[in-house]
């Protein structure tokens, strides 16, 4: 017997992903950020100076998705791309002063999202860990 979509894990994950993106949009819009830009910004705010490859690996984004995104963020004045002094093949990413200021403003977003869910922080942390474990079993990060 076939399962109804509402009884499938894949549908629960898919529909939740859409709901999460929709919930983040009004939190990011006043900052002028899209969700992918927010991920890049917060990743660089945490670990500045990453290579494009390191950033893509951490965010699980392919370079064909990441490169245009980085170009737009550089044009907006939020980050700087430069060749690595030791390996010219590598491009390093650094937040500008404007990018750091924007990242500071974005620090309120995770708590605002958590409040929107109405779930206890401990449940959200458990959910994050379970989802990360599932993701890593299905598609481990590239080395």
Annotate each predicted stretch with a short phrase.
Residues 11, 18, 22-65:
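N-terminal helix-turn-helix DNA-binding core of bacterial DNA-binding proteins
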Residues 1-31, 124-129, 133-141:
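N-terminal leader segment of winged-helix/HTH proteins
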Residues 49, 71-132:
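Charged, amphipathic alpha-helical coiled-coil/dimerization segments
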Residues 2, 60-63, 113:
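Compositionally biased, low-complexity segments enriched in small residues
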């Amino acid at each position: 017997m076939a399962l109804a979509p509402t009884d499938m894990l894949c549908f629960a994950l898919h529909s939740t992903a859409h709901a999460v993106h929709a919930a983040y949009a009004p939190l990011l819009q006043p900052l002028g950020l899209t969700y992918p830009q927010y991920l890049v910004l917060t990743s660089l705010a945490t670990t500045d100076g990453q290579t494009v490859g390191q950033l893509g690996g951490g965010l699980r984004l392919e370079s064909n998705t990441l490169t245009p995104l980085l170009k737009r963020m550089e044009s907006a004045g939020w980050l700087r791309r430069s060749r690595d002094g030791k390996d010219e093949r590598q491009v390093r990413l650094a937040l500008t002063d404007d990018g750091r200021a924007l990242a500071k403003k974005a620090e309120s977003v995770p708590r605002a999202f958590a409040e929107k869910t109405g779930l206890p922080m401990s449940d959200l942390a458990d959910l994050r860990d379970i989802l990360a474990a599932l993701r890593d079993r299905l598609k481990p990060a590239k080395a």
